[in-house]
Amino acid sequence: MEEQLIPIQWKDDALVLLDQTLLPNEVVYESFNTAEGVWDAIQVMKVRGAPAIGVSAAYGVYLGVKEFVESTEAEFIDEVKRVCAYLATSRPTAVNLFWALERMESVATDHTHLSITQLKDRLLEEAKEIHREDEEINRQIGEHALTLFHDGMGVLTHCNAGALATTKYGTATAPMYLAKEKGWDLKIYSDETRPRLQGSTLTALELQRAGIDVTVITDNMAAMVMSQGKIDAVIVGCDRVAANGDVANKIGTLGVSILAKYYNIPFYVAAPTPTIDLKTPTGKEIPIEERDASEVINRFGQYSAPKESKVYNPAFDVTPHENVTAIITEKGIVKAPFTENLKKLFQ
């Protein structure tokens, strides 16, 4: 087993991120000391995955105000709000980003009695707490998910909802790591996940390094492997779950869910409760990020289509709740009716 890749670290008063745009060919860690640097790292996907984005943004708030010139507490709180609003513009779909920023802003607005120095310390403590919580949440998701798995089963996953998308274990991959600890032999199939190939460059990489049996397939092979009986379950992560159970996840997830439904294969969504957005009624209201055309037609520095081609490049799609067998959270497994049962998680 190779050395573990650590996507997020806090060292020497700086945020240290594994540059995931360079994987699997290079392992490079980069330090960030400003909110602007963190914003850019999120936007260009040096760090990606909803939980990891949230943790990084929380540290970004602290970095954005740690050098704030001493003035009044009210001016400092305004600066915290400004930095939070700025970081919120980095990527629009992952609700963990906004959840983490709201927590950081609340630290400032709920502790107006503290001095500026004390508020800075409190902001850093909150960012570290968000970081710690994520690891425990992921393990709990894995433990619940493992009750749906058995030794020897074939599991398909899409994109990367692994340890590289979180702080440890991942969400969709958490049961895979825990199964490995139990001595189980799961056979994982990882869609390469066009256009950025997170399934092949990230999921396959981290599972292989952990000694987990993983096979890479192209996105258009999913139907074939399902028809051959190789897949017993599908498990994916998510960037946002609407109140009715609709799920926004990496582009291509919708198609996988349709195939799973056709072949009567359980389709599971691993979702930390911070990704559940009860304020958004359905998937239709979830904003879908569109990214640059170059990701589709110039992925490897050479055009795979005419340079002038029109390109549509949504980064996410929405899987309707009807296609979802269960949503697996750190608090337990949620099944339909989702509108009613998701609410119970927060009561």
UniProtKB/Swiss-Prot annotation:
Kindly list the residues the record flags as site (Transition state stabilizer): 159
Please state what class of enzyme this protein is: isomerase
Pathway as given in its UniProt record: Carbohydrate degradation
- Write the signal peptide boundaries: none
| GO biological process: one example | L-methionine salvage from methylthioadenosine
Q: Which domain of life is it from?
A: Bacteria
Binding residue positions for substrate: 48-50, 91, 198, 249-250
Catalytic residues (UniProt): 239 (proton donor)
Name the catalysed reactions: 5-deoxy-alpha-D-ribose 1-phosphate = 5-deoxy-D-ribulose 1-phosphate
Give an example GO molecular function: S-methyl-5-thioribose-1-phosphate isomerase activity
Any one Pfam family here would be IF-2B
Q: Secreted: present as a keyword of the record?
A: no
Q: Which family does it belong to?
A: Belongs to the EIF-2B alpha/beta/delta subunits family. DrdI subfamily.
What does it do?
Answer: Catalyzes the isomerization of 5-deoxy-alpha-D-ribose 1-phosphate to 5-deoxy-D-ribulose 1-phosphate, as part of a 5-deoxyribose salvage pathway that recycles this toxic radical SAM enzyme by-product to mainstream metabolites.
Question: What is the name of the protein in this document?
Answer: 5-deoxyribose 1-phosphate isomerase
Which organism is the protein's source?
A: Bacillus anthracis
